[in-house]
Amino acid sequence: MGVPKQRWTPEEEAALKAGVAKHGPGKWRTILRDSDFSALLRLRSNVDLKDKWRNLSVTAGGYGSREKARMALKKGRRVVPKLTAEPMDVDEKDMDNAHDTVIDVEPLAMAFEPLPFLESPDKSVARLDDLIVEAIRKLNEPSGSNKAVISGYIEDQYWPPADFQYLLSTKLKSLVNSGKLIKVNQKYRIAPSSSLGGISTKVSSSEGMNTENNNVKRLTKPQVVAELEKMKGMTREEAAAFAAKAVAEAEVAMAEAEEAARVAEAAENDAEAAKAFLDAVILSMRNRNAASMILRAC
Protein backbone atom coordinates (compact mmCIF):
# COMPACT_ATOMS: atom_id res chain seq x y z
CA MET A 1 0.00 0.00 0.00
CA GLY A 2 1.24 3.46 -0.86
CA VAL A 3 1.60 6.42 1.45
CA PRO A 4 -1.81 8.12 1.97
CA LYS A 5 -2.11 11.53 0.32
CA GLN A 6 -2.02 14.56 2.61
CA ARG A 7 -4.77 17.15 2.30
CA TRP A 8 -3.74 20.29 0.48
CA THR A 9 -2.91 23.17 2.76
CA PRO A 10 -3.82 26.78 1.91
CA GLU A 11 -0.11 27.52 1.45
CA GLU A 12 0.23 24.70 -1.09
CA GLU A 13 -2.84 25.87 -3.00
CA ALA A 14 -1.48 29.41 -3.03
CA ALA A 15 1.86 28.18 -4.36
CA LEU A 16 0.11 26.14 -7.07
CA LYS A 17 -1.99 29.09 -8.22
CA ALA A 18 1.01 31.40 -8.22
CA GLY A 19 3.05 28.82 -10.13
CA VAL A 20 0.34 28.51 -12.79
CA ALA A 21 0.14 32.29 -13.04
CA LYS A 22 3.90 32.46 -13.53
CA HIS A 23 4.55 29.49 -15.83
CA GLY A 24 1.12 28.61 -17.20
CA PRO A 25 -1.01 25.45 -16.80
CA GLY A 26 0.59 22.19 -17.85
CA LYS A 27 4.09 23.23 -16.72
CA TRP A 28 3.88 21.11 -13.58
CA ARG A 29 7.49 19.94 -13.57
CA THR A 30 8.70 23.48 -14.19
CA ILE A 31 6.65 24.71 -11.23
CA LEU A 32 8.08 21.97 -8.99
CA ARG A 33 11.62 22.94 -10.00
CA ASP A 34 11.02 26.67 -9.43
CA SER A 35 12.81 27.76 -6.27
CA ASP A 36 9.88 30.05 -5.40
CA PHE A 37 7.51 27.09 -5.03
CA SER A 38 9.64 23.96 -4.58
CA ALA A 39 9.81 24.31 -0.78
CA LEU A 40 6.02 24.53 -0.39
CA LEU A 41 5.31 21.80 -2.96
CA ARG A 42 8.09 19.39 -2.00
CA LEU A 43 5.55 16.69 -1.00
CA ARG A 44 3.66 16.94 -4.29
CA SER A 45 4.26 15.33 -7.70
CA ASN A 46 3.41 16.69 -11.13
CA VAL A 47 0.34 14.41 -11.18
CA ASP A 48 -0.79 15.87 -7.84
CA LEU A 49 -0.47 19.39 -9.24
CA LYS A 50 -2.39 18.48 -12.38
CA ASP A 51 -5.26 16.85 -10.49
CA LYS A 52 -5.50 19.65 -7.94
CA TRP A 53 -5.50 22.34 -10.62
CA ARG A 54 -8.26 20.52 -12.49
CA ASN A 55 -10.38 20.35 -9.34
CA LEU A 56 -9.81 24.02 -8.55
CA SER A 57 -10.73 25.08 -12.08
CA VAL A 58 -13.87 22.93 -12.19
CA THR A 59 -14.97 24.37 -8.85
CA ALA A 60 -14.31 27.91 -10.06
CA GLY A 61 -16.34 27.33 -13.22
CA GLY A 62 -19.36 26.02 -11.34
CA TYR A 63 -19.93 23.11 -13.72
CA GLY A 64 -18.71 19.53 -13.94
CA SER A 65 -16.79 18.21 -16.91
CA ARG A 66 -19.86 16.60 -18.53
CA GLU A 67 -21.95 19.76 -18.25
CA LYS A 68 -19.14 21.90 -19.66
CA ALA A 69 -18.54 19.53 -22.55
CA ARG A 70 -22.27 19.48 -23.35
CA MET A 71 -22.43 23.29 -23.27
CA ALA A 72 -19.40 23.54 -25.53
CA LEU A 73 -21.02 21.25 -28.09
CA LYS A 74 -24.25 23.25 -28.00
CA LYS A 75 -22.44 26.53 -28.52
CA GLY A 76 -20.32 25.07 -31.31
CA ARG A 77 -17.16 26.04 -29.55
CA ARG A 78 -14.01 24.19 -30.44
CA VAL A 79 -12.24 22.33 -27.63
CA VAL A 80 -8.67 23.53 -27.42
CA PRO A 81 -5.87 21.07 -26.59
CA LYS A 82 -3.97 23.27 -24.20
CA LEU A 83 -4.74 26.10 -21.77
CA THR A 84 -2.31 29.00 -21.83
CA ALA A 85 -2.00 32.03 -19.61
CA GLU A 86 0.05 35.20 -19.87
CA PRO A 87 2.97 35.14 -17.42
CA MET A 88 2.82 37.69 -14.61
CA ASP A 89 5.12 38.91 -11.88
CA VAL A 90 4.44 37.44 -8.42
CA ASP A 91 5.76 38.93 -5.19
CA GLU A 92 5.52 37.74 -1.58
CA LYS A 93 2.35 39.73 -0.84
CA ASP A 94 0.61 38.14 -3.80
CA MET A 95 1.77 34.73 -2.55
CA ASP A 96 0.16 35.37 0.86
CA ASN A 97 -3.19 36.30 -0.67
CA ALA A 98 -3.16 33.99 -3.66
CA HIS A 99 -5.25 31.28 -1.98
CA ASP A 100 -8.11 33.78 -1.52
CA THR A 101 -8.25 34.60 -5.22
CA VAL A 102 -9.50 32.69 -8.21
CA ILE A 103 -7.58 32.97 -11.46
CA ASP A 104 -9.90 34.01 -14.29
CA VAL A 105 -9.25 31.23 -16.76
CA GLU A 106 -11.42 28.81 -18.66
CA PRO A 107 -12.21 25.72 -16.51
CA LEU A 108 -10.03 22.75 -17.26
CA ALA A 109 -13.13 20.65 -17.82
CA MET A 110 -13.43 22.38 -21.19
CA ALA A 111 -9.87 23.30 -21.95
CA PHE A 112 -8.47 19.87 -21.29
CA GLU A 113 -11.13 17.59 -22.75
CA PRO A 114 -9.14 14.86 -24.55
CA LEU A 115 -7.85 16.79 -27.57
CA PRO A 116 -9.43 15.72 -30.87
CA PHE A 117 -9.31 12.14 -29.52
CA LEU A 118 -13.07 12.42 -29.04
CA GLU A 119 -13.86 13.73 -32.52
CA SER A 120 -13.57 10.50 -34.52
CA PRO A 121 -11.30 7.45 -34.71
CA ASP A 122 -9.65 8.62 -37.93
CA LYS A 123 -8.89 12.09 -36.60
CA SER A 124 -7.60 10.69 -33.31
CA VAL A 125 -5.05 8.55 -35.15
CA ALA A 126 -3.87 11.51 -37.22
CA ARG A 127 -3.68 13.74 -34.16
CA LEU A 128 -1.68 11.17 -32.19
CA ASP A 129 0.81 10.99 -35.08
CA ASP A 130 1.37 14.73 -34.75
CA LEU A 131 1.75 14.57 -30.97
CA ILE A 132 4.35 11.80 -31.15
CA VAL A 133 6.39 13.70 -33.74
CA GLU A 134 6.07 16.92 -31.72
CA ALA A 135 7.30 15.15 -28.59
CA ILE A 136 10.33 13.58 -30.32
CA ARG A 137 11.28 16.88 -31.98
CA LYS A 138 10.83 19.05 -28.89
CA LEU A 139 12.74 16.62 -26.66
CA ASN A 140 15.49 16.46 -29.32
CA GLU A 141 17.44 13.67 -27.66
CA PRO A 142 20.50 12.57 -29.70
CA SER A 143 19.78 8.85 -29.47
CA GLY A 144 15.99 9.20 -29.60
CA SER A 145 13.26 9.17 -26.94
CA ASN A 146 11.78 6.12 -25.26
CA LYS A 147 8.06 5.50 -24.80
CA ALA A 148 8.00 6.73 -21.19
CA VAL A 149 9.59 10.07 -22.10
CA ILE A 150 7.24 10.57 -25.07
CA SER A 151 4.25 9.69 -22.89
CA GLY A 152 5.40 12.08 -20.15
CA TYR A 153 5.76 14.97 -22.61
CA ILE A 154 2.28 14.46 -24.07
CA GLU A 155 0.69 14.07 -20.62
CA ASP A 156 2.39 17.27 -19.40
CA GLN A 157 1.31 19.33 -22.40
CA TYR A 158 -2.13 17.86 -23.10
CA TRP A 159 -4.98 15.95 -21.47
CA PRO A 160 -4.99 12.44 -22.99
CA PRO A 161 -7.85 9.91 -22.73
CA ALA A 162 -7.98 6.99 -20.32
CA ASP A 163 -6.68 4.45 -22.85
CA PHE A 164 -3.80 6.70 -23.91
CA GLN A 165 -1.02 4.21 -23.07
CA TYR A 166 -2.59 1.53 -25.26
CA LEU A 167 -3.12 3.99 -28.13
CA LEU A 168 0.46 5.23 -27.81
CA SER A 169 1.94 1.71 -27.92
CA THR A 170 -0.16 0.79 -30.95
CA LYS A 171 0.70 3.97 -32.83
CA LEU A 172 4.44 3.75 -32.09
CA LYS A 173 4.51 0.19 -33.42
CA SER A 174 2.58 1.27 -36.52
CA LEU A 175 4.91 4.19 -37.22
CA VAL A 176 7.97 1.94 -36.88
CA ASN A 177 6.49 -0.70 -39.20
CA SER A 178 5.67 1.96 -41.80
CA GLY A 179 9.22 3.31 -41.69
CA LYS A 180 8.24 6.75 -40.39
CA LEU A 181 10.02 6.18 -37.08
CA ILE A 182 13.23 4.30 -36.32
CA LYS A 183 13.42 2.21 -33.15
CA VAL A 184 16.86 1.47 -31.71
CA ASN A 185 17.36 0.12 -28.17
CA GLN A 186 13.75 0.91 -27.21
CA LYS A 187 14.18 4.54 -28.34
CA TYR A 188 12.37 6.23 -31.20
CA ARG A 189 13.72 8.70 -33.76
CA ILE A 190 12.13 10.27 -36.82
CA ALA A 191 13.39 8.57 -39.98
CA PRO A 192 15.62 10.90 -42.06
CA SER A 193 13.38 10.64 -45.14
CA SER A 194 10.07 10.13 -43.34
CA SER A 195 6.91 11.85 -44.57
CA LEU A 196 6.07 13.03 -41.05
CA GLY A 197 6.26 16.73 -40.38
CA GLY A 198 5.86 17.92 -43.96
CA ILE A 199 8.74 16.02 -45.59
CA SER A 200 7.41 14.57 -48.82
CA THR A 201 9.71 11.59 -49.22
CA LYS A 202 8.98 8.27 -47.52
CA VAL A 203 10.97 5.18 -46.63
CA SER A 204 9.16 2.30 -48.31
CA SER A 205 11.95 -0.04 -49.39
CA SER A 206 15.71 -0.32 -49.44
CA GLU A 207 15.74 0.34 -53.20
CA GLY A 208 13.70 3.54 -52.85
CA MET A 209 15.91 4.73 -50.04
CA ASN A 210 19.04 4.18 -52.10
CA THR A 211 17.49 6.14 -54.99
CA GLU A 212 16.50 9.07 -52.80
CA ASN A 213 19.92 9.31 -51.15
CA ASN A 214 22.17 8.46 -54.09
CA ASN A 215 23.57 11.99 -53.96
CA VAL A 216 25.11 11.32 -50.55
CA LYS A 217 28.78 10.52 -50.82
CA ARG A 218 29.90 7.38 -48.98
CA LEU A 219 33.43 7.60 -47.60
CA THR A 220 35.85 4.77 -46.95
CA LYS A 221 38.14 4.78 -43.91
CA PRO A 222 41.14 6.28 -45.78
CA GLN A 223 38.84 8.95 -47.23
CA VAL A 224 37.57 9.78 -43.75
CA VAL A 225 41.14 10.24 -42.53
CA ALA A 226 41.84 12.51 -45.50
CA GLU A 227 38.70 14.54 -44.82
CA LEU A 228 39.71 14.98 -41.19
CA GLU A 229 43.05 16.34 -42.31
CA LYS A 230 41.24 18.82 -44.52
CA MET A 231 39.09 19.96 -41.61
CA LYS A 232 42.14 21.29 -39.79
CA GLY A 233 42.34 24.13 -42.31
CA MET A 234 38.60 24.77 -42.59
CA THR A 235 36.77 27.85 -41.39
CA ARG A 236 34.04 27.54 -38.79
CA GLU A 237 31.31 27.66 -41.45
CA GLU A 238 33.02 25.01 -43.59
CA ALA A 239 33.48 22.75 -40.57
CA ALA A 240 29.79 23.13 -39.63
CA ALA A 241 28.71 22.23 -43.15
CA PHE A 242 31.00 19.20 -43.15
CA ALA A 243 29.63 18.05 -39.78
CA ALA A 244 26.03 18.40 -40.99
CA LYS A 245 26.89 16.32 -44.04
CA ALA A 246 28.46 13.62 -41.86
CA VAL A 247 25.37 13.51 -39.64
CA ALA A 248 23.13 13.11 -42.69
CA GLU A 249 25.25 10.23 -43.96
CA ALA A 250 25.13 8.54 -40.56
CA GLU A 251 21.34 8.86 -40.39
CA VAL A 252 20.97 7.40 -43.86
CA ALA A 253 23.20 4.47 -42.93
CA MET A 254 21.19 3.80 -39.77
CA ALA A 255 17.91 3.96 -41.69
CA GLU A 256 19.23 1.51 -44.26
CA ALA A 257 20.38 -0.82 -41.51
CA GLU A 258 16.92 -0.70 -39.93
CA GLU A 259 15.30 -1.42 -43.28
CA ALA A 260 17.68 -4.30 -43.93
CA ALA A 261 16.88 -5.75 -40.51
CA ARG A 262 13.15 -5.57 -41.25
CA VAL A 263 13.64 -7.26 -44.63
CA ALA A 264 15.79 -9.98 -43.05
CA GLU A 265 13.22 -10.60 -40.34
CA ALA A 266 10.43 -10.88 -42.92
CA ALA A 267 12.53 -13.29 -45.00
CA GLU A 268 13.24 -15.40 -41.93
CA ASN A 269 9.53 -15.59 -41.11
CA ASP A 270 8.76 -16.62 -44.70
CA ALA A 271 11.45 -19.30 -44.55
CA GLU A 272 10.07 -20.69 -41.31
CA ALA A 273 6.56 -20.79 -42.77
CA ALA A 274 7.82 -22.55 -45.91
CA LYS A 275 9.74 -25.10 -43.84
CA ALA A 276 6.68 -25.80 -41.70
CA PHE A 277 4.60 -26.32 -44.85
CA LEU A 278 7.24 -28.64 -46.32
CA ASP A 279 7.38 -30.69 -43.12
CA ALA A 280 3.60 -31.03 -43.16
CA VAL A 281 3.66 -32.20 -46.80
CA ILE A 282 6.40 -34.77 -46.10
CA LEU A 283 4.53 -36.10 -43.06
CA SER A 284 1.34 -36.37 -45.09
CA MET A 285 3.12 -38.30 -47.85
CA ARG A 286 4.69 -40.68 -45.34
CA ASN A 287 1.33 -41.39 -43.75
CA ARG A 288 -0.21 -41.97 -47.17
CA ASN A 289 2.58 -44.40 -48.20
CA ALA A 290 2.26 -46.28 -44.91
CA ALA A 291 -1.49 -46.64 -45.44
CA SER A 292 -0.94 -47.93 -48.99
CA MET A 293 1.55 -50.56 -47.79
CA ILE A 294 -0.89 -51.76 -45.13
CA LEU A 295 -3.66 -52.12 -47.70
CA ARG A 296 -1.39 -54.08 -50.03
CA ALA A 297 -0.36 -56.42 -47.21
CA CYS A 298 -3.99 -57.15 -46.47
UniProtKB/Swiss-Prot annotation:
Keyword annotations: Chromosome, Coiled coil, DNA-binding, Nucleus, Telomere, Transcription, Transcription regulation
GO cellular component, one term: nucleolus
Kinase as UniProt keyword: no
One Pfam family named in its UniProt record: Linker_histone
Domain H15: 124-192
Cell location: Nucleus; Chromosome; Nucleus, Nucleolus; Chromosome, Telomere
PROSITE patterns: H15, HTH_MYB
Domain HTH myb-type: 1-61
Assembly information from the UniProt record: Forms a homodimer and heterodimers.
Family: Belongs to the histone H1/H5 family. SMH subfamily.
Function: Binds preferentially double-stranded telomeric repeats, but may also bind to the single telomeric strand.
Name of this chain's protein: Single myb histone 2
